[in-house]
């Protein structure tokens, strides 16, 4: 992740979604559309005819399946954490969380 360019174009909704993904305990109400919006902001997302989503982050392609409901399940959160950590976004999530703690 290039911090100077990638962190700048994340709006507050993207940052909130990123923090929710890395939140402990795991959040059970992360909206699929919010996840797609975040992934589209930091990489590329292409939907296939089979309903799968090809997500490319930092040159690495991942395949995701649309959830049955509007929110993603715990396994998808785990997969997203892995993908985002590999792309350097765990640090940004921690920074955003720490900023929110400052009063």
What are these regions (language model features)?
Residues 2-103:
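Basic nucleic-acid-binding interfaces
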